[in-house]
Amino acid sequence: AAARGDASVRVLLLTGAGRGFCAGQDLSDRAVAPGGAAVDLGASIDRNYKPLVLALRSMPVPTVCAVNGVAAGAGANLALACDIVVATKSASFIQAFCRIGLVPDSGGTYWLPRLVGTARAIGLAMLGDKLSAEQAAAWGMIWQAVDDAAFAEAVEKLLAQLAAAPTKGL
């Protein structure tokens, strides 16, 4: 929210810390206590993830996602909410929802078919297969997959290029 109102912000970067980008939503805090009411996962998504996806999509400046490792579930879909996604060649994307009986959330059912086509989106969503960053780039799901050793430099160059552009018109 602070970045939205800051005129000095020219581009927004979303990335992970450590070896992975984002393993997705932590469902452990959604466990039902003995005798307790079922947790409404839909309400949780509406409260926690939908506002983040909408904020990314409505930023007045370009949004870049730098995927530095595994992007699973909601993590993969948060990446897809950004304008440009660049990933290390060792990164991967996994629509892991089917493994736990959930429908892809955080914009997954919206973005996947638009980026990779209906058949591929259905396959990714129903099978939960790991998609390499290189395959994701070949399918048009992300902008590019970069050698791990050159990743930081490539991201910095991309950010500088976007920040130097007329960002309101991009």
Regions from the PLM with identified roles:
Residues 1, 8, 16-55, 71, ...:
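Glycine- (often His-adjacent) and acidic-residue-rich active-site loop
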Residues 7, 54-168:
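Crotonase-fold acyl-CoA enzyme core
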